[in-house]
Swiss-Prot record:
Record-linked InterPro entries: ZIP
Biased composition (Basic and acidic residues): 61-93, 103-112, 185-208, 267-279
Disruption phenotype: Morpholino knockdown of slc39a7 protein causes neurodevelopmental impairments, decreased head size, smaller eyes, shorter palates, and shorter and curved spinal cords, as well as a reduction in intracellular Zn(2+) content in the brain. These morpholino elicited phenotypes can be rescued with Zn(2+) supplementation.
Keyword Repeat: no
Tissue: Highly expressed in brain and eye of adult zebrafish.
Name this protein carries in UniProt: Zinc transporter Slc39a7
PANTHER family in the cross-refs: ZINC TRANSPORTER SLC39A7, ZINC TRANSPORTER SLC39A7 HISTIDINE-RICH MEMBRANE PROTEIN KE4
Functional note: Transports Zn(2+) from the endoplasmic reticulum (ER)/Golgi apparatus to the cytosol, playing an essential role in the regulation of cytosolic zinc levels. Plays a role in maintaining zinc homeostasis and organism development especially in eyes, brain, and gills.
TM region(s), chain numbering: 3-23, 128-148, 161-181, 215-235, 318-338
Membrane-related topology note: Multi-pass membrane protein
Sequence similarity: Belongs to the ZIP transporter (TC 2.A.5) family. KE4/Catsup subfamily.
């Protein structure tokens, strides 16, 4: 019995001891799992089967508690492991530092953008004004090549050919360039300021306006054309009335300027024909020559006024095109230059026919460049001025051109007796002037 009870007691003690050993090993196994979990990113190695008396098993105990603490810390902040979280914190700090650096760069870039904008405005003005001076100076230089010096019998045939070319250019400019662009303001002169504004305005024109508004716009263009014709007629009638009382007192003076304006050869011929010229000057037909010369001078100044307004609209177009971009500005400049060369030659012929010398006519033509410069400046200073100005300036100028071509230039071609070949040359010159405007309008 005693032996049996002792054996039973030993068995119970053995069972208790084995349970404690199993519990401790299970606890150490769970802790090792936690340590391994804590060291999954740190790279530390744990001995999974170590006993509690092993020094190797007891050494990482503090590290395990430290890493478990880190694990709890990371769980509170970012639900991540301590090492990964601390690395993420450093990364975030570096990112914040980079953000401040970018902010500093943004301030520097804004200053550079402002300075670049100022430089771009200076370049814009230089390009636009330079293009305007180019379209004014190039035709002026071409006038030196024209052999006509003044309104004399020696150059009369060539002058009539140039006048025919001028009438064709004026009529073609009015009906193929000015009036169509006044009817469709977004085609050339009011291409303004940016592609967005063009698209907006085009959309408003196509969808927002009714047929009644379009009809009213066409009516207004037609009225402005008629207004230009009537205005030029009124100005010429008014000047005739002012000069009408002085026609008899200055009956001999117009012939003197013609002799001064002529070449030296004409002066020599005038001296040889001294008596014949005096007899002719005393006859009654001189009154008609005086009246025609005074009328032609008035029409010459009217042509200058029309040319001034036309150059103003060209300046508006150049300024608006350079606001869009340098490439658009260059194309517009070339187009206007091709258009201005024949136009200026015709205006020069009209001024010479009105009694001006070649030098005076060239100087007056050069003064009209002020209108182009004024138009360019207005277009650059106020971007929306192009639409408002071309709404009435273009058709009004077209009316002036029609009046000058039909009332002033064409009657000069019908005056006097011309040979068949001379008349053919005049008609061909007129058609050539119209044809040049057709080509320019086609490729514009």
């Amino acid at each position: 019995m005693r032996v049996f009870s002792k054996s039973l007691l030993l068995i119970a003690v053995g069972i208790l001891m084995s349970q404690q050993t199993l519990a401790h090993s299970h606890h150490h196994h769970g802790h090792g799992d936690g340590g391994c979990h804590g060291h999954s990113h740190g790279g530390a190695k744990m001995h999974h089967g170590a006993s509690k008396w092993s020094a190797e098993a007891n050494l990482p105990h503090a590290e395990e508690e430290h890493h478990v603490h880190d694990h709890g810390h990371t769980h509170n902040h970012a639900h991540d492991h301590g090492h990964a979280h601390s690395h993420g914190d450093i990364h975030d700090h570096g990112h914040a530092h980079k953000h401040g650096h970018a902010h500093d760069h943004g301030a520097e870039k804004s200053k550079k953008v402002v300075e670049a904008g100022k430089r771009n405005m200076v370049e814009l003005w230089m390009q636009a004004i330079g293009a305007t001076l180019l379209i004014s100076a190039a035709p002026f230089l071409i006038l030196f090549l024209i052999p006509v010096q003044s309104n004399t019998d020696q150059h009369q045939n060539l002058l009539k050919v140039l006048l025919s070319f001028a009438s064709g250019g004026l009529l073609g400019d009015a009906f193929l360039h000015l009036i169509p662009h006044a009817l469709e303001p977004h085609s050339h002169h009011s291409q303004p300021h940016s592609e967005e504004s063009h698209g907006q305005s085009h959309g408003e024109e196509s969808h927002g306006h009714s047929h009644g508004a379009a009809h009213g716009h066409m009516m207004s263009v037609g009225l402005w054309v008629l207004g230009g014709i009537v205005a030029f007629l009124v100005v010429e009638k008014f000047v005739r009335l002012l000069k009408g009382g002085h026609s008899h007192s200055h009956s001999h003076s117009p012939s003197a300027p013609k002799s001064k304006d002529s070449d030296e050869e004409d002066d020599k011929k005038g001296q040889k024909k001294g008596e014949k010229d005096k007899v002719v000057s005393q006859q009654k037909p001189t009154k008609k020559t005086v009246e025609t010369s005074s009328d032609i001078k008035v029409s010459g100044y009217l042509n200058l006024a029309a040319d001034f307004t036309h150059n103003f609209t060209d300046g508006l177009a150049i300024g608006a095109s350079f606001l869009v971009g340098p490439a658009v500005g260059a194309v517009t400049t070339i187009t206007i230059l091709l258009h201005e060369v024949p136009h200026e030659i015709g205006d020069f012929a009209i001024l010479v026919q009105s009694g001006c010398t070649k030098r005076k006519a060239m100087c007056l033509q050069l003064l009209t460049a002020v209108g182009a410069l004024a138009g360019t400046a207005c277009s650059l200073l106020a971007e929306g001025v192009g639409d408002a100005a071309t709404a009435w300036i273009l058709p009004f100028t077209a009316g002036g051109f029609v009046y000058i071509a039909t009332v002033t230039v064409l009657p000069e071609l019908l005056a006097g007796h011309s040979s068949f070949w001379q008349s053919l040359l005049e008609i061909l010159a007129l058609l050539f002037g119209v044809g040049m405007m057709v080509l320019i309008a086609e490729y514009e």
